Amino acid sequence: MQSPRNRRTGIGVFVAALLVARLVHAEDTEVSALVTPVASGFYTVMPCRAVDTRIGVGPNGGPALGGGETRVFGIAGRCGIPNSARAVALNLTVTGPAAAGTILVYPAGESTPSASTINFTAGRTRANNVVVATGEAGQVAAFCGMPPGATVDVIFDVVGYFEDATGNKPPVVAAGPDAALAMPANSLALSGTFSDDGKPAGATYAAAWSVTAGPPGVAFSAPASPSTNVTFAAAGTYTLRLTVSDSDRAGFDDLTVKVTATLPDVLRFLDQASFGPAPDQSDTVRTQGLSEWIEEQFRAPETGYPPLPPESGTTPAECPYNSVCYRDKYTTYPLQNLFFTNALYGGDQLRQKVAWALHKIFVVSGADIPMPSRLTPYLRVLNRNAFGNFRTLLGEITLNTAMGRYLDMVTSTRTRPNENYPREILQLFSVGTVRLNPDGTEQSDANGPVPTYDQSVVDGLAKAFTGWTYGTQFPGGVTNYIDPMVLVPGNHDTTAKLLLRGVTLPAGQDGTQDLNAALDNVFTDPNVGPFIGKQLIQMLVTSNPSPAFVARVTSAFDDNGWGVRGDMKAVIRAILLDPEARGTGPGAPSFGRLREPALWLVASLRALGAQSADGTANADGYLSPRTTPLGQNPLRPATVFSYFPPDYEAPGAGGLLGPEFGIHSATTALGRANFVNTLVYNTSGCPVVGRPCLRPNTDPNNLNGNTNGVSLDFASLVPFAGSLAAPDPAPLVDELDRRLLHGTMSAAMRTEVTQALNAIAPTDPVPPGDVLGGKFRRVQAGIYLVLTASQFQVER
């Protein structure tokens, strides 16, 4: 990669170039200069984004600038800008302004200038080339001249800097060219070089390799030498930095290494990060890269749950029980169907998967609040905050009216403070009942496990959360479940409250102050990272993560690398790109998780190209009647403790956790086999020959389902089934292994499946007596055997 210090020129030459550029700038680009006159040299850097308020909250990130706000950004130390820089050259972009305004950029610590750096109108993206002196600690300040309440995002792309032209210069470093590896190859030779100006006299040089971006698990054989070997534990895109010091100044250069995953690991990754790989998706993701796919998913438009108008809790005459109107407005039927169609076809697979995990932590059950208009705002909170900040999620879920109704906060007053929500936010939603180390292991003393809180903390939170209730009613006296709860000041307890870690809220605060302070107290507790992080690992990757895995995720929760706590994107990256989640094999025997019924069903359908019964459209999502007999009725968990407890021990597993085994029994195991039998062998009456189907609903009132039905695409598997001339079923077994088991089929299972398929002659269809043929029946048998096998039902 080209060295960041690759060109030097005089300041006058550069400013002259800016003046020429000013004469030819595009309509939405301006050029200005704000420079402290010094005897300087100008050094270019590879264009680098130093500030972007559109990304997660952080020192050089979001949120957007607000009207009247001044914010300071550190520039030195980023993008190859040394601490000695006197000024920086950058491109300033403003985007998404809510109103017309101006941005003033100037040295931090100095007075706000009167001249604007860039002017803009509402909704218009504009850019400006700027040279600005750096102030205190290499920082620049930005003032937003907009009306109060209006916001705008700003982006700083650095292209160069000025520094004193005399004295010692840092070494000029070249880390080497960018590189690519395809696993299982995971080692690379690095040959960095550097040059220096010979100052100071008698200088001694020290080199150091480091990792500035990418998954953990990188090892250098000689990290203090410019020439070294580097080994990667997992696929991903890595930025490696070579820094060289002359005992006074240091220079550095970066190179990028893209490590491509093996095909089995890509398929395993898609099982973890989505609702299962779809046909032909794996090659695309493998070429793209796992970390790049994650970032693309962060940007993907949300599918989710569209907002619904409010509905009365009293069923009107036109919605009698057992009518389509009643079904659609007073039962969870539409939301359950939407959950399954989002899971099957949504382009935002990662958001939907994380939101499903959050639903299992922050439980509101449709069994108690079945009306779609009332439950939808809760589901939208989960979707909206899946990639946001955990503190924001805590705040929005606390004031969500469905949650308030489900756990009784909506009726909690100073005279009757309710302990239900305070107890569950502690026990289930944030810190748990036992003090944890960062690696998720329990802390103990002479009395046993150390409790996280006692009854006095529950009492304190109950008082802090008093006074919140339903928002303004809609016409006709319809209760407001659409908007967050509102505060009734007279119903709030204004006495002092004891919170976690001995923190006391002072008396006299209003309800909003108490609620925010209480949530901050919960959010900043050191238990949140390991307690929530471990559960997310269990729901996405493995039921029994190692303490080291949990500790790495806790570290990402505590600090995203920008000093921000609770960044869900950082947590998701840490989980999915961790070496224990990635690699060429499933790891230890304890690795993996039982697929819960909803995920098992959707993964099966996605892998087999599920469409409508006639194969022309999406399936209708009417699948909850299929998972309910298996122990899981989606969006309707039986209690606030979710569908299954995260600390449930799998029977006979020697203490290993298996949360999903909490709803798995001999009956539900047989139910899975029966469902696969129906799914694979039901071809009678299906609209398309060769597409087994769950037939569309034929009820003229359409009370029990939509009309699309669901069918599977077996046509792509038939060519692998062999022929009478070449009857070996090995190609079909290999393809089923690749598509459903990610190449992990055991030798014993392969032998058994092969024997079963050999018993079926691979004949072609002979209508009218045999419209399917032996090849098709081989495919049916192979799919049945794999989908019902433990090796598929346990995701590894």
Question: Would you name each region that the model predicts?
Answer:
Residues 27-167:
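Short edge beta-strands and adjacent beta->alpha junctions
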Residues 251-260:
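C-terminal edge beta-strand
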Residues 286, 327, 335-340, 371-620, ...:
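Active-site substrate-binding loop specific to GH73 endo-beta-N-acetylglucosaminidase modules
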